[in-house]
UniProtKB/Swiss-Prot annotation:
GO MF annotation, one: oxoglutarate dehydrogenase (succinyl-transferring) activity
Purpose of the protein: Lipoamide dehydrogenase is a component of the alpha-ketoacid dehydrogenase complexes. This includes the pyruvate dehydrogenase complex, which catalyzes the overall conversion of pyruvate to acetyl-CoA and CO(2), and the 2-oxoglutarate dehydrogenase complex, which catalyzes the overall conversion of 2-oxoglutarate to succinyl-CoA and CO(2). Also acts as a component of the glycine cleavage system (glycine decarboxylase complex), which catalyzes the degradation of glycine.
Binding site for FAD: 56-65, 74, 139, 174-176, 346, 352-355
Highest taxon of source: Eukaryota
Cofactor list: FAD
Organism the protein comes from: Saccharomyces cerevisiae (strain ATCC 204508 / S288c)
Any Gene Ontology CC annotation: oxoglutarate dehydrogenase complex
Extent of the transit peptide: 1-21
UniProt-recorded name of the protein: Dihydrolipoyl dehydrogenase, mitochondrial
Disulfide pairings: C65-C70
Co-factor remark: Binds 1 FAD per subunit.
Residues binding NAD(+): G211, G212, G213, I214, I215, G216, L217, E218, E234, V268, G305
Amino acid sequence: MLRIRSLLNNKRAFSSTVRTLTINKSHDVVIIGGGPAGYVAAIKAAQLGFNTACVEKRGKLGGTCLNVGCIPSKALLNNSHLFHQMHTEAQKRGIDVNGDIKINVANFQKAKDDAVKQLTGGIELLFKKNKVTYYKGNGSFEDETKIRVTPVDGLEGTVKEDHILDVKNIIVATGSEVTPFPGIEIDEEKIVSSTGALSLKEIPKRLTIIGGGIIGLEMGSVYSRLGSKVTVVEFQPQIGASMDGEVAKATQKFLKKQGLDFKLSTKVISAKRNDDKNVVEIVVEDTKTNKQENLEAEVLLVAVGRRPYIAGLGAEKIGLEVDKRGRLVIDDQFNSKFPHIKVVGDVTFGPMLAHKAEEEGIAAVEMLKTGHGHVNYNNIPSVMYSHPEVAWVGKTEEQLKEAGIDYKIGKFPFAANSRAKTNQDTEGFVKILIDSKTERILGAHIIGPNAGEMIAEAGLALEYGASAEDVARVCHAHPTLSEAFKEANMAAYDKAIHC
């Protein structure tokens, strides 16, 4: 009794004593990580009858994609495009605007944040609906069959005590983090990652971006529309490393017309803040001529990719294998060295894409239930939500040439598409690659309006081994942008009608 009274009189002692307590729970499946791979796996596991739990330390479900990636960036891209259209196209569309059109940065950011909040809350509701136990806390391996969940300081709703979860099956889905650039310190104010770029409090006069991949080009598009002078520095000789070469060149042409400046085959030597001038000073070097150039920008965005995130997981504690790139090593059934510990999403092999992660989450759980699961890694679409949008799936021309595969090309421009004409949005084309002998579709590449939506038809065709004629003989509604996809397939095996 005296011991209890003394603890109550000493909050610090009481707090430290409470933290030593543990609560033991048992589950059939525990997923560490609540991003696209993790939360989808958790819901699917519960639907298949497993007693399921998900551990997430962010405090909000959805991972990088929903909180500081795909979703907030699309809100900024959409709203900045509307702003740009009103500024540059209203008059030609017969819309007279009286007064200035301005960006209210606070409300611009609020619209983004509202979308994120609604979607993260929606996932929590799905957890409740499917009876998934949700632990807000740090999850780490106690041993190969136990997960320790510890409180996260300052996180609302975090577990109050350590939990030890006794688990039959574990799925690791801890995701990825921003890849740092050697010698450049990110402060998320003047030198920012993609996370900081999503939440700038004012529009910079000049924005320099290190990296000409999807993240950099999307953020460059946003701020270029809002008035920033955007410079993209890319080490490779072309932007969009995984794009078809022809499409990459067309994309650069369209973005350059919108005001983005490109320095290709260029490396960054250094970058540092100069607070006296309120700028970041950047030194770059042309890799062909070795000529150096000094750049200045109010904001520098470092967008050189992402890397697997396993900090605090305790992978080394149980001997999980990690490769040179920091990825957890698995077999073709997502198994680590322990068959009951599976790994999915960005933390392991394959493209770091939310939809790929979701597919793996479902497949891994189905393997637990039935011994079978399916992800077709040759049919994972990619989309860049610039304007025009860029989307692709399957093989590029470069890949087909390297593999020695004979192929034919079918192309159709949006300038010849009736819906694109009515929308006054005609930049770009659809490009189809087919096997010369069988005429099966090998790859599809779209640059143009709504490319991200249209690419789904290409994915379906690839998944079921369709030929170009199979697609061309499907009746497509008129007038729609999807008719351009039909016509490109017609052009691949015969001739397009409207071009």
